[in-house]
């Protein structure tokens, strides 16, 4: 229990997959719990996780996070965890069925967006059902961003 007067950081983002929003069109997002060992939680709290090349896969009645990197906890001894092991995601049966139906559609995939600690101190993963963008879609998004930036500069310049 935290001592009185101390403030817990709410929704502290530990790792973020920034490229996912550029490479994929996000259709729907879900919040999933992570099954972690003690040393993995300690390593996460240090903020050294990497989910840039990771993805989620549906196997049987479960969803697994694959290829995420949680480095070993330095203060741990022989009971340390494997950095790139598969981690089970905790979702409701209804959510798993919805995700499975989404994956079975053409071009859909499960992409992790960010790992964070919620207000109860639990490690959570924001998971997105997404569709891969084509090269011309990425260029169009980039042009739109540039135009919005220019527009805001022009409006800012006119208001002075």
Curated annotation (Swiss-Prot):
CDD domains: SmpB
InterPro entries the UniProt entry points to: SmpB, SsrA-bd_prot, SsrA-bd_prot_CS
Domain of life: Bacteria
Protein name, entry field: SsrA-binding protein
Comp. bias regions, Basic and acidic residues: 137-149
GO biological process: trans-translation
An example molecular function term from Gene Ontology annotations: RNA binding
Entry keyword annotation includes RNA-binding: yes
Zinc among keywords: no
Annotated localization: Cytoplasm
Protein family: Belongs to the SmpB family.
Record Pfam families: SmpB
Native organism: Agrobacterium fabrum (strain C58 / ATCC 33970) (Agrobacterium tumefaciens (strain C58))
GO cellular component: cytosol
HAMAP family: SmpB
Keywords assigned by UniProt, alphabetized: Cytoplasm, RNA-binding
């Amino acid at each position: 229990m935290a001592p009185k007067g101390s403030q817990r950081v709410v929704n502290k983002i530990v790792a973020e997959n920034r490229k996912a929003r550029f490479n994929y069109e996000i259709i729907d997002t879900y919040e999933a719990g992570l099954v972690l060992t003690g040393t993995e939680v300690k390593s996460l709290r240090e903020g050294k996780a990497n989910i840039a090349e990771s993805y989620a896969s549906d196997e049987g009645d479960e969803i697994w996070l694959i290829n995420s990197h949680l480095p070993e906890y330095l203060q741990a001894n022989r009971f340390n965890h494997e950095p790139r092991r598969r981690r089970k995601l905790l979702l409701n049966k209804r959510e798993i069925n919805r995700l499975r139906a989404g994956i079975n559609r053409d071009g859909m995939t499960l992409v992790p967006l960010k790992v964070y600690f919620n207000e109860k101190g639990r490690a959570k993963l924001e998971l997105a059902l997404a569709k891969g963008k084509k090269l011309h879609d990425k260029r169009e998004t980039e042009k739109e961003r540039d135009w919005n930036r220019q527009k805001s500069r022009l409006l800012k310049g006119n208001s002075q």
